C-alpha cells in the first residue's frame, strides 16, 4: 500500500516538472489535528521565491480538485536547502563522497542515528564510512536522511 507521500509524489510530479522544477521530495507531518505537507523543489541554478509561489498555486489547485488529504493541512513549498533531505536512491547517488546523516527505523548495532561519508550504493544498500569503519545500511530501514552542510 502506497503512503500519502508516494501518492502525492505521483500526483504532483508532472505538474511541478511542467513549471521547470524537479519535485525533490515530500514530507507530511501531523501535529494534533492538522497536517503540514512540505514539498521540496529543485532546479538547475537554484529555486527562487517565484518558483515556490508558482508551484504552490499549481499544487493547491490540484489538491483542491483531487482532494487526497482528508484532514486540514498547510502546504509549504521550498528549496531542499544545503542540508537537503534525501528521499530516493538516485538522490543518494548524487552525494557519494559527501557526509550524510541518517535516522533509521530499526537500530543497527543499537544505534538509530548515523553520520558519515557516503561511500557507495549497491542495490538497496548504502555504505557509510563512520570513524574509519564501513557501515552498511539497508535503504528500506532509513526513516530520514539528509546531506550534512559544511561551512
Swiss-Prot record:
The keyword Cytoplasm applies. Keywords: Cytoplasm, Ribosome biogenesis. GO terms for cellular component: cytosol. It is found in: Cytoplasm. InterPro entries: Ribosome_maturation_RimP, RimP_C, RimP_C_sf, RimP_N, RimP_N_sf. One of its GO terms (biological process) is translation. Pfam families: DUF150_C (PF17384), RimP_N (PF02576). It comes from the Bacteria. Required for maturation of 30S ribosomal subunits. Belongs to the RimP family. This is Ribosome maturation factor RimP. The gene is rimP.
Amino acid at each position: 500500500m502506497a503512503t500519502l507521500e508516494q501518492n502525492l509524489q505521483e500526483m504532483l510530479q508532472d505538474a511541478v516538472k511542467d513549471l521547470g522544477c524537479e519535485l525533490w521530495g515530500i514530507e507530511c507531518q501531523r501535529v494534533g489535528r492538522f497536517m503540514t505537507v512540505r514539498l521540496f523543489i529543485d532546479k538547475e541554478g537554484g529555486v527562487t521565491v517565484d518558483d515556490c509561489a508558482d508551484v504552490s498555486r499549481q499544487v493547491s489547485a490540484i489538491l483542491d480538485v483531487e482532494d487526497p488529504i482528508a484532514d486540514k493541512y498547510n502546504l509549504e513549498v521550498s528549496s531542499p536547502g544545503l542540508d537537503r533531505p534525501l528521499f530516493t536512491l538516485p538522490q543518494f547517488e548524487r552525494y557519494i563522497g559527501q557526509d550524510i546523516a541518517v535516522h533509521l527505523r530499526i537500530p543497527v548495532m543499537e544505534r538509530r542515528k548515523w553520520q558519515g561519508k557516503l561511500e557507495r550504493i549497491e542495490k538497496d544498500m548504502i555504505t557509510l564510512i563512520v570513524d574509519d569503519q564501513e557501515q552498511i545500511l539497508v535503504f528500506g530501514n532509513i526513516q530520514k536522511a539528509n546531506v550534512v552542510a559544511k561551512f
